[in-house]
Design a protein with these regions (language model features):
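TOPRIM metal-binding catalytic domain and adjacent DNA-binding surface shared by DnaG-type primases
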Residues: 1-57, 74-89, 131-134, 194-209
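Phosphate-handling DNA/RNA-contact segment within nucleic-acid enzymes
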Residues: 43-135
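Acidic beta-strand-to-loop metal/phosphate-binding motif
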Residues: 91-93, 133-148, 169
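Acidic, metal-coordinating catalytic cores used for nucleic-acid/nucleotide bond scission
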Residues: 119-123, 143-154
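Long, basic/Gly/Ser/Thr-rich N-terminal segments
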Residues: 129, 141-144, 152, 171, ...
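Short, aromatic/basic amphipathic alpha-helical patches
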Residues: 129, 151-162
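Interdomain "pre-motor" coupling segment immediately N-terminal to P-loop NTPase/helicase cores
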Residues: 168-205
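The Walker A/P-loop phosphate-binding site
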Residues: 202-254
Length: 254
């Protein structure tokens, strides 16, 4: 991961509160929290969001009861986007902030970002950042394994540059990266990234999967045509085949 500019500007109406602390239950270290500037402020966890020019705009706050609120202004950027360069080898995209932190904890020094509004707004949020993804060679979508996560994966993958998208798959029973790390299985996160499968849209077939079909000779014909030219072109007819003969196109000669 190329070193990024971590200089952040702050308007006067929002400010950091609290301090970086280890998230014991989540198995996320103080160092990871400090890297993302995710601070504990009493009962709140505060996730900073920045504008595209790295000006601090506001915070998403989370309570122990998993209630979320926003302070300051909302932005179009992804969580963690201010920490990453505009180009790179690989970028991981998660549904939630704690998943992104879990990804960094398991696989540090790579680009880990998350959606600002979860799976429901995934397509809209990614659409606003298409220019960012153009700069990366590989885009790993690491969304939750529930139905909402699967739908978001399909919607987002279809938006992103063809040939760059891979889908991360966690083994059961883990539902997301945070769940795996809470169970002390950082290796599952790493393997999900390393073994992410290339995205293949419905109806599109990988040419490599057809190699055997096109390189094997056709089976012998069951019957030969009585027409020499047609026989030479088709090598006869086989059961299950249909040969359609149509007229040429153009102006009628009649």
């Amino acid at each position: 991961l190329t070193r990024a500019d971590h200089t952040h500007h702050m308007p006067t109406n929002v400010q950091f509160k609290g301090s970086a602390q280890r998230l014991q239950k989540r198995r996320i270290s103080e160092e990871t929290c400090q890297h993302y500037k995710v601070y504990r402020d009493g009962e709140l966890l505060r996730f900073p969001y920045y504008s595209s020019d790295k000006t601090l705009q506001g915070f998403k706050t989370k309570t122990k009861l998993k209630d979320f609120k926003y302070e300051g202004n909302t932005t179009d950027t992804l969580f963690g986007q201010s920490l990453i360069p505009s180009t790179g080898k690989r970028i991981m995209v998660y549904e939630g902030e704690l998943d992104a932190l879990s990804g960094w904890e398991a696989y540090p020094n790579w680009a880990h970002v998350s959606l600002p509004h979860g799976a429901a707004s995934a397509k809209k949020d990614i659409q606003k950042q298409l220019q960012l993804f153009q700069g990366y060679e590989e885009i790993v979508l690491f969304f939750d394994k529930d139905e909402a996560g699967k739908m978001a994966t399909e919607a987002v993958a279809a938006l992103l540059p063809s040939g760059k998208v891979k889908i991360a798959h966690l083994p059961d029973p883990y539902k997301d990266a945070s769940d795996a790390l809470q169970n002390n299985d950082a290796e599952a996160i790493r393997k999900a990234i390393w073994n992410a499968s290339p995205y293949q849209p419905d109806g599109i077939v990988d040419g490599k999967s057809l190699l055997e079909l096109v390189t094997n000779p056709s089976p012998p014909c069951d019957f030969e045509y009585p027409f020499a030219g047609l026989q030479q072109m088709t090598h006869g007819i086989r059961y299950g085949e249909l040969t359609v003969i149509s007229a040429g196109t153009g102006l009628s000669l009649i």
